[in-house]
């Protein structure tokens, strides 16, 4: 089923995070038990979607999983982010709005 993610994986391999972060580092919570709950939930949802071939191409991140990824941006970069003036941002709710290509180009990120 992972062949669906080939384009996203290849784009990640070309990006700046490939040497320091895996898929789970960005897309799964770091805390227990959320880590295992989200892993199980995504495993089920991905298996179902891929088996039934019911997913958009290119693959798109859900709003929930986007919130997990943004939380993980702040998990790793929070100290630095607090030093930067994010003009026009009242809350850091979506790092990918301005940094869409940081994880793996713009494939499946920050798009409706």
Where are these regions (language model features)?
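Short sequence/structural segments immediately N-terminal
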Residues: 1-112
């Amino acid at each position: 089923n992972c062949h669906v993610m080939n384009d996203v994986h290849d784009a990640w391999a070309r990006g700046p995070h490939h040497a320091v972060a895996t898929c789970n580092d960005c897309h799964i919570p770091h805390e227990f038990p959320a880590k295992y709950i989200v892993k199980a939930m995504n495993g089920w949802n991905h298996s179902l979607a891929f088996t039934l071939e019911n997913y958009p191409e290119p693959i798109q991140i859900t709003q929930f999983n986007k919130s997990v990824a943004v939380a993980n941006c702040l998990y790793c970069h929070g100290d630095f982010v607090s030093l930067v003036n994010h003009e026009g941002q009242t809350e850091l709710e979506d790092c990918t709005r301005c940094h869409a290509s940081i994880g793996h180009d713009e494939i499946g990120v920050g798009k409706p």
